[in-house]
């Protein structure tokens, strides 16, 4: 076993990486409220895992979406648990993110030189809200349908560009298959990818600059 480790150590300097990770200074004022960002990340990872599991059975069509969700809940082994965990962790992610924002604001973690860390956090907040909007529509039940119709209709109040924006969001003049396809693509591919990129940037900046000091 030691020979295998030595082989990797010679090429990748694993011990130096491990020492850098484990030897980072943690200020004495840090408490449990500084873990809220990490809990938000954990919820996101749970979302990715449970969401990926459901893609094996979910059908993103207006005729089959609701039936496929019912199938997941009633026929798939532990499907009810997977979907329930997905929903619970989604709610928890939003709650932890809000509490994390309050903690950062109240402790001045957004001030110089951490402005960019705050900006990436704001972007992550918008992405999290977008997850909620797009995911809410995927069962394509009455609640999901009318929620999508209302949300996508909001830009219509904007002069000149309002109507084109609505059509861009819906994929057509009215809510239908194109809308569901767009929201499914956003929810399962675009938003997770963007969230992963901005989370990486967020954590790298925290890693570089360290945790902000007490007020």
From Swiss-Prot:
Signal peptide: none annotated. Binds 2 heme b groups non-covalently with two histidine residues as axial ligands. Heme b 1 binds at residues 34, 100, 103, 202, 212. GO terms for molecular function: electron transporter, transferring electrons within cytochrome b6/f complex of photosystem II activity; metal ion binding; oxidoreductase activity. InterPro entries: Cyt_b/b6_N, Cyt_B6_PetB, Cytb/b6-like_sf, Cytochrome_b_N_euk/bac, Di-haem_cyt_TM. The chain crosses the membrane at residues 32-52, 90-110, 116-136, 186-206. GO terms for cellular component: chloroplast thylakoid membrane; membrane. It is a multi-pass membrane protein. Its cofactor is heme b; heme c. Heme b 2 binds at residues 83, 86, 187. It is found in: Plastid, Chloroplast thylakoid membrane. Keywords: Chloroplast, Electron transport, Heme, Iron, Membrane, Metal-binding, Photosynthesis, Plastid, Thylakoid, Transmembrane, Transmembrane helix, Transport. Heme c binds at residues 35, 207. The keyword Nuclease does not apply. CDD domains: Cytochrome_b_N. SUPFAM superfamilies: Transmembrane di-heme cytochromes. One of its GO terms (biological process) is respiratory electron transport chain. Heme 1 (or BH or b566) is high-potential and absorbs at about 566 nm, and heme 2 (or BL or b562) is low-potential and absorbs at about 562 nm. NCBIfam families: PRK03735.1. Belongs to the cytochrome b family. PetB subfamily. Component of the cytochrome b6-f complex, which mediates electron transfer between photosystem II (PSII) and photosystem I (PSI), cyclic electron flow around PSI, and state transitions. The 4 large subunits of the cytochrome b6-f complex are cytochrome b6, subunit IV (17 kDa polypeptide, PetD), cytochrome f and the Rieske protein, while the 4 small subunits are PetG, PetL, PetM and PetN. The complex functions as a dimer. This is Cytochrome b6. It comes from Spinacia oleracea (Spinach).
């Amino acid at each position: 076993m030691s020979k295998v480790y030595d082989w990797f150590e010679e090429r990748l300097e694993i011990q130096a990486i491990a020492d850098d990770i484990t030897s980072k200074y943690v200020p004495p004022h840090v408490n449990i409220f500084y873990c809220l960002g990490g809990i938000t990340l954990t919820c996101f990872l749970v979302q990715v895992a449970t969401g990926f599991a459901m893609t094996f059975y979910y059908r993103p069509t207006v005729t089959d979406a609701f039936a496929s969700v019912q199938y997941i809940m009633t026929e798939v082994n532990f499907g009810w648990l997977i979907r329930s965990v997905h929903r619970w962790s989604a709610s928890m992610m939003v709650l932890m993110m809000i509490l994390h924002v309050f903690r950062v604001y109240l402790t001045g973690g957004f001030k110089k030189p951490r402005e960019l860390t705050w900006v990436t956090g704001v972007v992550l907040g918008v992405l999290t809200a977008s997850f909620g909007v797009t995911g809410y529509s995927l069962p394509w039940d009455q609640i999901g349908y009318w929620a999508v119709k209302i949300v996508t209709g909001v830009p219509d109040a904007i002069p000149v560009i309002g109507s084109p924006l609505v059509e861009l969001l819906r994929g057509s003049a009215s809510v239908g298959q194109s809308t569901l396809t767009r929201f499914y693509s956003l929810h399962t591919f675009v938003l997770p990818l963007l969230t992963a990129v901005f989370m990486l940037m967020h954590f790298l900046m925290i890693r570089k600059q360290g945790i902000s000091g007490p007020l």
